[in-house]
Curated annotation (Swiss-Prot):
Record key words, sorted: DNA damage, DNA repair
SUPFAM superfamilies, alphabetized: ATPase domain of HSP90 chaperone/DNA topoisomerase II/histidine kinase, DNA mismatch repair protein MutL, Ribosomal protein S5 domain 2-like
Function: This protein is involved in the repair of mismatches in DNA. It is required for dam-dependent methyl-directed DNA mismatch repair. May act as a 'molecular matchmaker', a protein that promotes the formation of a stable complex between two or more DNA-binding proteins in an ATP-dependent manner without itself being part of a final effector complex.
GO annotation, cellular component aspect: mismatch repair complex
Domain of life: Bacteria
Transmembrane domains' residue ranges: none
Protein name in the entry: DNA mismatch repair protein MutL
One Gene Ontology biological process: mismatch repair
Family: Belongs to the DNA mismatch repair MutL/HexB family.
Gene source species: Bacillus cereus (strain Q1)
Keyword Disulfide bond attributed: no
A Pfam family hit: DNA_mis_repair
One Gene Ontology molecular-function label: mismatched DNA binding
Length: 647
């Protein structure tokens, strides 16, 4: 007897289910798409325990005739294609004939359906086996219930995520379908609680508002273009409204939501330099084309497609977005808080002074952490870094760059600068001895550094350049310090300590701050409320998918409390599962950057001295939290070589 045998239908369906039915969201997607293909204008989705216990889809579509009910649950049985030519002209969302038998093979399924012309059909299937079939009274449409998903495949059930995660996956796919078909009214319920309701009036902007909030919808730019092969319609947000991941961009091809990286990349390219690095827009793009130009038969899940004229399509998307942005005013409203990536902000600050015209410098506005004494004039070297930056009351005078004060450092008597330069040098006749001596000095310096650990030697300020770089000296030579990076390191260590203990120091807000989220974001955050308290986010549920913040830690940078809260919330949504250690680190880095002095801000000599002294107290005074250098050293010997005082 041969070793190769044909698998029975039930086992084949179980294998197919592994590709088609990965989780409850897959079931919802397939069943809702079937309802849309059946010309439904209203679809209700009822879930229990994120679909693991029960999924029920009710539509008002065409229904299924009695004679087709059994055939519909056979593999590769479909009403949507007849021959191979139809495979290249697919207009429907489904066509493979795999979804229903795959779902029925791993669940307990009940179907009630009617075409409206005859009595309805009641069908019960368990694990792929038909248990009951009978006629029943039913309105036109289909009512299908899937219970105990994966009851006969415990290995698959074992890999399911938490209720919140699985529900988030379902809401995400329902959102995409709602955007793809705004002409269909969708209602989503979980444990009898309504989560989403779209009107079905065909206005995709209303759908976007119900998903991402009205505030985001107000910042949408309409996109529309047409070529010989493609028609593009959609909305994208103004550059001031961005997110930290591409997940907020949705691409629709002939009414089908698809995941296509090159399309998302084309949307980004359409913004060109309008977006900060690492930031992404919220966007919805619907593309209509001849079905011959797109292959949807790539994967059973039908989320991947291939285009035959991909480059032409990408070029059209890029040019359409660029043209749209040229027609509108892109200056953000004063009332809108524009979020910026802290690392991008600091990189931009480094170049602000390069092309600036000379101007009369003014004292910087320094942000103090809440709780600091704002009347204090003298800097203090200590534990609360921002005290250093309170401007003195007297009128400020521009710093005299590179002019030493009386108490400043005096050159070492060993310096060769004090001696006249001679054309002939005694060591020139013995270069080898000099190189050995120089090497010994370098080894000695390394040993001294190893003994001192991270201790930064005392630095004596001598001036400031462009309100950005501090010049200081000691007997080792000249130091150039990036003042923003220096205070960023100081603030980082201060906030890193504070973020670890938040319960004792809390400031009440006069007006609670409201945070509106999409349903997917809301569910993700709701799951982490207790963990978020550990990093200073005290959230209370407010309404359907909103939170309010009534208080915050006193050490939040003054005047930037709401921006800090928004940034931290975005980190939580991006991380999906909160890692407290990582979130504390990100929060400390973010706040240290926002609370630090910027480029083109002039400081008094006392302020500079206090900054350098406190930098010495940090555990790592050499790099900022982003890894950029804080100071650069030029030895006296290197300077003398530059000026040809030694050869």
């Amino acid at each position: 007897m041969g070793k190769i045998r044909k698998l029975d239908d039930q086992l084949s369906n179980l294998i197919a289910a592994g590709e088609v039915v990965e989780r409850p969201a897959s079931v919802v997607k397939e069943l809702v798409e079937n309802s849309i293909d059946a010309n439904s204008t209203s679809i209700e989705i009822h879930l229990e325990e994120a679909g693991l216990s029960k999924i029920r889809i009710i539509d008002n579509g065409d229904g299924i005739a009695e004679e087709d009910c059994i055939v519909a649950f056979e593999r590769h049985a479909t009403s949507k294609i007849k021959d191979e030519n139809d495979l290249f002209r697919i207009r429907t969302l489904g066509f493979r004939g795999e979804a229903l038998p795959s779902i029925a093979s791993v669940s307990e399924l009940e179907l009630i359906t009617s075409t409206g012309d005859a009595p309805g059909t009641h069908l019960i299937i368990k694990g792929g086996d038909i248990i009951k079939q009978e006629k029943t009274a039913s309105r036109k449409g289909t009512d299908i219930t899937v219970q105990n998903l994966f009851f006969n495949t415990p290995a698959r059930l074992k890999y399911m995520k938490t209720i919140h995660t699985e529900l988030g996956n379902i809401t995400d796919i329902v959102y995409r379908i709602a955007m793809s078909h705004p002409e269909v009214s969708l209602k989503l319920f979980h444990n009898e609680k309504k989560l989403l309701h779209t009107s079905g009036n065909g206005d995709v902007r209303q759908v976007l508002a119900s998903i991402y909030s009205i505030q985001v919808a107000k910042k949408l730019v309409p996109i529309e273009a047409e070529s010989l092969d493609f028609t593009i319609k959609g909305y994208v947000t103004l550059p001031e409204v961005t997110r930290a991941s591409r997940n907020y961009m949705s691409t629709i091809v002939n009414g089908r939501y698809v995941r296509n990286f090159v399309l998302m990349k084309a949307i980004q390219q359409g913004y060109h330099t309008l977006l900060p690095v690492g930031r992404y827009p919220i966007g919805f793009l619907s593309i209509e084309m001849d079905p011959m130009l797109v292959d949807v038969n790539v994967h059973p899940a039908k989320l991947e497609v291939r285009f035959s004229k991909e480059q032409e399509l990408l070029k059209l998307i890029e040019e359409t977005l660029q043209a749209a942005f040229k027609k509108i005013q892109l200056i953000p409203d004063a009332g809108v808080t524009t979020k910026k990536k802290e690392k991008d902000e600091s990189v931009q600050e480094q170049f602000k002074f390069e092309h600036a015209k000379p101007k009369e410098p003014s004292m910087p506005e320094i942000v103090l952490p809440t709780g600091m004494d704002e009347k204090q004039e003298e800097p203090q070297a200590v534990k609360q870094p921002a005290q250093l930056w309170q401007p003195p009351k007297q009128e400020w005078q521009p710093p005299q760059s590179l002019v030493r004060e009386e108490q400043s450092w005096q050159p070492s008597t060993k310096s060769i600068i004090e001696e006249p330069i001679r054309e002939e040098k005694s060591w020139n006749s013995n270069d080898e001895d000099f190189e050995l001596e120089e090497l010994e000095e370098e080894v000695q310096e390394i040993e001294e550094i190893e003994m001192n650990g991270n201790d930064l030697p005392p630095l004596y300020p001598i001036g400031q350049m462009h309100g950005t770089y501090i010049f200081a000296q000691n007997d080792k030579g000249l130091y150039m310090i990036d003042q923003h990076a220096a205070q960023e390191r100081i603030n980082y260590e201060y906030f890193r300590d504070k973020v670890g203990r938040v319960a004792q120091e809390v400031q009440e807000l006069l007006v609670p701050y409201r945070i509106d989220l999409s349903l997917t974001e809301f569910l993700r955050v709701e799951e982490q409320l207790e963990e978020l308290k550990k990093v200073g986010l005290f959230l209370e549920q407010f309404g359907h998918q909103s939170f309010i913040v009534r208080s915050h830690p006193t050490w939040f940078p003054k005047g930037q409390e709401t921006e800090i809260i928004d940034e931290m919330m975005e980190q939580v949504v991006k991380l999906k599962k909160v890692d407290i250690k990582k979130l504390r680190e990100e929060a400390a880095i973010m706040m240290s950057c926002k609370a630090s002095i910027k480029a083109n801000q002039y400081l008094t000599n006392d302020q500079i001295f206090a900054l350098l002294e406190e930098l010495r107290t940090t555990t790592n005074p050499y790099t900022c939290p982003h890894g950029r250098p804080i100071l650069v050293h030029h030895s006296t010997y290197e300077l003398e070589k530059m000026f040809k005082r030694v050869m």
